[in-house]
Each structure stands twice: as C-alpha cells, then as structure tokens.
Amino acid sequence: MIDKSSADILEISAKCGYLTGLLKNVYRSANIIVTDMSPLLLDSFDHNHKLLIDDENLEFQKDSFDLIIYSLGLHWINDVQRFLYNIRTFLKSDGIFIGNFVGGDSLKNLRKSLIDNEIASGFKHSPHISPFIHFDHVPMLLLHAGFSEVIVDYENIALKFENPIVLMKEIKNIGESNALNSQHNYAISKKMFSLLKNYINVFEDNITLISFIAAPNKNSLRLKLL
C-alpha cells in the first residue's frame, strides 16, 4: 500500500482542484504537487504546492513520486510515447501511475456530421476533432514506455443533445474544444450552422472513457491493491 503519511504524489492537470481535494482527504500527511497550464484554474482552489506548467513540459527528478495521477488529459498530448516515458522516470520503482482519457471512437457521429456538412456547404474538410488513442493501443504504449504491469479498462458513455451545435457548445464549455481550431482558415458558415442546427431528431453520439493503472515493476499492482 502507498504510505499515506509520507507519500509523494503528483497530480497533472488539476483543473478546478476537485480531485486534489479528494487526494488531500485520503493522504492527509502526503506531499501533493499539482500542476496545470491555466493560471485561472490554479487560482480557483487552495493548495500549497501548485505549479503552472504545460503537461508536455514537466520537469521532475527521477524516482520522485509514489503516485502520479493524470485525469482526462492524455488525449491532448502530442508525443504520447515521450510523455509516458517521462512519467515512468518520475515514478519511484514501486510507484503507480493512474490515468483516464477520452479515446477510441469517441464523437464519431459528430465527426461524420461535420464532414458531411462541410461538403454540403462547399468547404474542403479540415479536422475539427483531435485523433484519439484506441483502447487496444494503450497497453503497448505503456509497456514501450517502461511500465511492466498494466491494467486497462473502458466505459462507453452515451450522449444525447438537441443537435450537433449544442454538443459542440457543451464540449467548449468544459474546456475540451479542439486544439486544432486555431489552424482553421474559416469559421462555420451560416449555411453549415443551419444544417447542423436543424436536425429533425435528437442527435446521439458517445464517448469512450479509457482508464488505466500502470506500475514500473511486476507484482507492484497486486501487492498495492490487496
């Protein structure tokens, strides 16, 4: 088990600090460092050890942490293999890395809807939705990064919205709007907006939430989860 009295914990991309609060309740005497790339989010909650830093530019000493947690962020990482390798080096030999992210065939209906409506509006298609890591690729990515034990699971979550525009607004409101948007040379036209908005039926889609636990050494997970 992780020693609750002296654990060194890193939470990457803490956002509004909800998970930070849960960690502080469980590991009351632990050294918990949290990071985020948004100063507004870091200022939104109280914690002694906060770092303003991009998720892909983390710099810590080797063997620094007993536990590293990364919730709903891996789908934003450009060089996933390099990121996972760095996480592995930050962990102590008996440490644990826990994370989840949006992956698989998430938002495939929205992706298709955008392509169809761009064609109907006379636009050349540009990517509106970032590519996702598939469930089957996760174990190999972690193993190649130096982890020896990996447990991966997933959950499909159904979405129902009035139309694609409402779904896109909700995605934007939770801070998950596409990083590729800045590369577009145009905004959604009035014609395309109308096509997306005037769906006859409820617009349905899904997201796949992929979760994993990984450890550098074999048997670490079994011993810690007993």
Curated annotation (Swiss-Prot):
A Pfam family the protein falls into: Methyltransf_11
GO MF entry, a single one: S-adenosylmethionine-dependent methyltransferase activity
Root EC class: transferase
Enzyme Commission no: 2.1.1.-
Gene3D superfamilies tied to this protein: Vaccinia Virus protein VP39
Transmembrane segments: none
Domain of life: Bacteria
Keyword hit for S-adenosyl-L-methionine: no
InterPro entries cross-referenced by the UniProt entry: Malonyl-ACP_OMT, Methyltransf_11, SAM-dependent_MTases_sf
Keywords: Methyltransferase, Transferase
Entry-linked SUPFAM superfamilies: S-adenosyl-L-methionine-dependent methyltransferases (SSF53335)
UniProt GO BP: methylation
Entry's family note: Belongs to the methyltransferase superfamily.
Protein's UniProt name: Putative methyltransferase RP459
Naturally occurring in which organism (per UniProt): Rickettsia prowazekii (strain Madrid E)
